[in-house]
Amino acid sequence: MDNKITVLGVKESGKTTYLAGMYICMSAGVKNFSLVAKDPNQDMYLEKLWEKISNGEKPYPTDKPEQYQFHIAHNYKPVMDFDWKDYPGGILAEPSAPECQNLIQDVKDSDCLLLILDGRLFVSTRAQNRDEYKNEILKKIKYDKGVRDEVKMFQRLSSENFKLPPVGVVVTKCDLIPEAYQSAVQEIIRETFAQLIEESERVVLLMSVTLGGDIVPGFVPDPFNIEQPIAFSVLAILMKYLVLAKMQKDKNANFIEKYSGLIFSFFTRMYPQ
């Protein structure tokens, strides 16, 4: 059974930068989990990409769909392989284009969808308090072409009565957002994507990530929450297998439950007890 994660975001939303940062962090190991690209050439590409980022060079935006094959392990014991399908920003602007149709099919075939939102969308230049900030950003997002295209994609999928996979909404560059307004960001996303989030049977998680600052010469990465979107995605895949294993009374159910619990620990910083 194939495992697939599809990643979508507007141009320059930070998808490529996030991928490189996530890969370097996870390949080094986080909570005894480690990630590696199965293709050595992809590993080399991501390593070189991270080197450029660390030197203050911003990566070029993705201009075509890219697929990576990753392997995740715990204490060097295999957990799973999965495909990471990254689509270029702006692809939803042409719904009838073959690339857009391929995207829709990949969403339908995916175990998890990561929707990347550019943290710059949430930067205010005028707000003096939380209410002013929320009203300003809600208006800005309402008229953002990229966000509207994403909302329309969900509308088209719903017209086909398609059940969406778990969705992770990821705000990149969250260091640009004042700490006092971070909770308002969650509210803004919930209102913007209300029809997506308020369906009780749908699994949607909101996350904020950053590499720790603007990518300029001399940039020193200080990643925050960089592992959580990938942990959420892997957890969604494990849940798929757990349901199947329990239905078939498969002995692997205990194995899956063990790793599901371990991966859930990635979220303890976001949701402290």
PLM regions: where:
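Conserved G1/Walker A P-loop phosphate-binding module
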Residues: 1-69, 73-82
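Alpha-helical scaffold elements adjacent to nucleotide-binding pockets in ATP/GTP-utilizing enzyme cores
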Residues: 6, 17-25, 109, 149-153, ...
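A short hydrophobic beta-strand->loop->alpha-helix junction that borders the nucleotide-binding pocket
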Residues: 8, 38, 87, 117-119, ...
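Switch II of P-loop NTPase G domains
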Residues: 59-114, 120-129
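Conserved C-terminal guanine-recognition region of P-loop GTPase G domains, centered on the G4
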Residues: 101-200
